[in-house]
């Protein structure tokens, strides 16, 4: 009789990526205790499963005091044109005053004004909260309610201070054996 490890339960059907899955398991366990995760930056070449890994991670974040998955929002950053659009079309309707895990895929495409705003939003402090003002609105960010995950193939295009505010998780390129296993699963 085969036993299933905790990592296999948390990341079913994800082949390889042992180190990344181990780190993410640690953060899932920490989230269970504190309702917070560090801001994460998944970095890997195309086709290494950044989005799939982030989605699997997100499915394992449970709202504290409830037995349901924390809501998830994923956007492709190529759709973000400027800070005003980001605030009006993403922050206001989807993130403000919400319990949510927010994944920004292809984050190297985030415009500079949005990256600069994220520097303020993600600035670490003991209260685990920040306020970002834009126009007439104040966005009060509580990291016990909102979790940020970024994914990129081109980390060198990200502002260094923004990278410094994130826990970097590098995914490995798949071996031929792992690619064969992935094909068999699909």
Spans of model-derived segments:
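Conserved AAA+/SF3 P-loop NTPase catalytic/coupling segment centered on the Walker-B
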Residues: 82-86, 96-125, 155-164
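Short glycine-/polar-rich loops that comprise or flank the Walker A/P-loop
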Residues: 7-9, 37-38, 67-72, 98-100, ...
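Walker A/P-loop
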Residues: 29-75, 91-93
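Conserved catalytic/switch belt of AAA+ P-loop NTPases
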Residues: 29, 92, 112-145
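Short glycine-rich substrate-engagement loop in P-loop NTPases that contacts/grips substrate
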Residues: 21-22, 68-99
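Conserved nucleotide-binding/hydrolysis micro-motifs of P-loop NTPases
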Residues: 46-48, 78-82, 108-111, 148, ...
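Pre-Walker A (pre-P-loop) alpha-helix and adjacent loop at the N terminus of AAA/AAA+ ATPase modules
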Residues: 3-43
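Conserved AAA+ ATPase core "coupling" helix
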Residues: 87, 157-186
